[in-house]
Amino acid sequence: MTAALTLMAKDRDGPKISYQVLMIPATDASVDTASYHEYGTGRFLARAFMKYAWDLYAADAAARNNPYVSPLRASLQQLQGLPPALVITAENDPLRDEGEAYARKLQEAGVSDARGEIAR
């Protein structure tokens, strides 16, 4: 949510956001990363539940491709000018790969970032 709201605030000329902290962010509606397949069978954040939740939130492909829904799908140009970000992922979490991918994409777009990983 932080990623989408920060992008939206930039696109709509406010409010000005100085810094973003993304704690284990869900940044893509595909639910199809290696970490989802490796850790998405547990009792806390199951891949099947996340697929169900995404179906409720954004039922069709057009909605899921919207950068306000899946910030990882934003272009580098759309991400340029965002405030600095702290992206925190968890080592054994289904959302790890998409959080790390989003942090890399922010860096490619020239957004100052710091990354942290919560180890097991």
Each language-model region and where it sits:
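Alpha/beta-hydrolase superfamily serine-hydrolase fold, recognizing
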Residues: 1-120
